[in-house]
Amino acid sequence: FSLAGNRLSLYGQDGSLKVYDADTGALLTDVNAGTIGDDQRVTLDCEEDGFVWMELRDADSYEIAAIRVYGPEGLVSDLSSLNETYNYLGYLTTDANGRPLYYGTRSVPGSSYATGCDVLDETGNVVMQGLGSCYSYYDNSLNALPDHVFVARRGFYYGWMDTDGNWLYCQSIFSSVNADDELGY
């Protein structure tokens, strides 16, 4: 099971995947996600509107074998093929239509430590690229970000960006007089 905010997701041994609204008890998602093998572990991350991020990992090596997104209508996408492109995949926020958006971090060619971040739709298509980083850091906290907004860094700027790629608030990473003395991000 997974409890995220006011969403409870349950994955049964028979492959059933159910998502409930913890406040009202309403059933948001009721699908069959298939069973997993004895040599796999499952991780669930319940997102907004009944969407579930499911990772299947090898029980011994913990390598990701599959990443699937389920919604109220069943399997939305199998993002397993993106494991070869991205070092990490995760939930970001929803778009203005309530559909989930994800982020993928990848190594930048020619650099041993730099990473880039792409914003992906639920089918794995890139909807925004060229970000240095992006995350929904304030999610589920007292300082939650507005709907359809995430923290991003692009070039020498960081701040709040909407899902259309517009800055709602940004500042230079060199915003301090003592920029050389501070990390800035």
Regions found by a protein language model. Give the residues of each.
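Residue-level detector of conserved, function-critical positions
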Residues: 1-185
